[in-house]
Amino acid sequence: MIEKIDHIGIVVRDLEKAIKVYSDVLGLKVDKVEQVEEFKVKIAFLPVGEVLVELLEPIGPGMVQDFLAEHGEGLYHICYKVTDIDKALEEVGKKTKLRDKRPRPGGAGSRVAFLEPEGMLNVETEFVERKKGA
């Protein structure tokens, strides 16, 4: 079901400033920047080996803006890459509560879904199914 850790999400107030920090301090390079309307965020992906650092700046009301207002900038979620997100949600949904009963559109044509954090020891947990070759 789970292939690997896909990315670690970090909420930021200003995406350009955050990119500069991660570039200047850690030497990371931006692979992709895009806007995901479904989640009202602008995101940047910075590869670290096979895992991505995902910087998220809210651009409207939603989960990310709520998180920023309540907690400030910082670690937001961990995302696991799955081979079949529908099957993963069906299996995991028998064991814990799902925030998303069905996958939603994510960045780069992916499909994503979140679990309820309470069932995951208060860790915001996401599944992603990427297009073949992505």
Predicted segment positions?
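Amphipathic alpha-helical segments
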Residues: 16-29, 88, 92-94
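Short loop/beta submotifs within extracellular cysteine-rich repeat domains
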Residues: 26-29, 53, 63-64, 122-123
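C-terminal "cap" of GNAT-fold acetyltransferases
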Residues: 36-51
